[in-house]
């Protein structure tokens, strides 16, 4: 089944004026989103993406970029990951990765959400998406390593799948290397998935920070015909894949 898939970290409410028209224009078969407020799903779905799955990973009222001094507001709004599609979606799995945290903890600082994983069937394809564990400098720590093992164990039952999302794990570092040894990495030629202007680290010096942290992996049985990245939509670039 030919399929167009988009993965995008939308950074909460910051870029909805760009994200909504982008998704409407793209008319993808499947959209995997990270950092989504549940209350914004009707707007994001527009009239094209009639089906969705959502997994909350945080209670928060305010976004969380410490570097731009916004402060922290735990709040009660549900914030997490989502899959949108005009195709029927069958949820196969929705799980959090940190058994030591409440399923939906309150925002108490950067990286304090409970990382999540959704696995769903869209048409003939099994699609998994995650907003993976954050570390301050993108270096793997013990918690991130533990969560990776949990994620891989959760994916074991699916012999054929697409895995995408914001992994908070730069290409070439330990977490990415482990994933790339198990799956086919389809973004080896991508220069960065951090927007050169909209990401907080690039706002004063465009293009200063270049990291590939948004990845698309598949099992070897799936053919990806083309991968592109699109900036100017959010603080992360949109990863757009055309699958055979």
Model-derived segments and spans:
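Active-site beta-strand/loop signature of hydrolases that rely on acidic residues for catalysis
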Residues: 5-9, 19-45, 84, 127-130, ...
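Active-site-proximal beta-strand elements of phosphoester/diester hydrolases
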Residues: 2-11, 93-95, 124-134
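Structured beta-strand-rich core segments of catalytic domains in phosphoester-bond hydrolases
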Residues: 36-124, 228-230
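Short, flexible loop segments at the rims of nucleotide/cofactor-binding pockets, characterized by
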Residues: 7-12, 105-109, 138-142
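Conserved residues at the C-terminal ends of beta-strands
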Residues: 34-37, 55, 95, 133, ...
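Short hydrophobic/aromatic-enriched beta-strand-loop microsegments
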Residues: 8, 50-56, 184-188
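Metal-dependent phosphoester-hydrolase catalytic domains
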Residues: 156-161, 168-244
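Charged helix-capping and loop-helix junction motifs
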Residues: 112-113, 142-149
């Amino acid at each position: 089944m030919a399929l167009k898939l988009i993965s995008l970290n939308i950074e909460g409410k910051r870029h909805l004026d760009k994200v909504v028209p982008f998704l409407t224009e793209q008319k993808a078969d499947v959209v995997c989103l990270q950092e989504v407020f549940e209350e914004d799903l009707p707007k994001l779905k527009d009239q094209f993406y009639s089906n969705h799955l959502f997994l909350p990973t945080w209670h928060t009222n305010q976004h969380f970029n410490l570097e731009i001094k916004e402060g922290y507001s735990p709040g009660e709004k549900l914030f997490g990951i989502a899959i949108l599609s005009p195709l029927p979606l069958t949820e196969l799995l929705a799980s959090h990765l940190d058994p030591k945290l409440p399923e939906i903890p309150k925002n108490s600082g950067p990286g304090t959400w409970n990382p999540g994983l959704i696995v769903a069937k869209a048409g003939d394809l099994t699609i998994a998406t995650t907003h993976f564990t954050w570390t301050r400098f993108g270096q793997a720590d013990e918690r991130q390593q533990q969560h990776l093992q949990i994620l891989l164990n959760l994916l074991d039952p699916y012999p054929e799948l697409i895995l995408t999302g914001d992994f908070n794990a730069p290409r070439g570092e330990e977490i990415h290397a482990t994933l790339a040894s198990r799956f086919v990495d389809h973004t080896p030629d991508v220069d960065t998935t951090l927007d050169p202007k909209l990401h907080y680290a690039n706002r004063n010096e465009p293009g200063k920070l270049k990291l590939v942290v948004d990845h698309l992996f598949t099992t070897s049985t799936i053919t990806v015909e083309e991968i592109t990245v699109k900036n100017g939509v959010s603080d992360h670039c949109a990863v757009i894949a055309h699958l055979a």
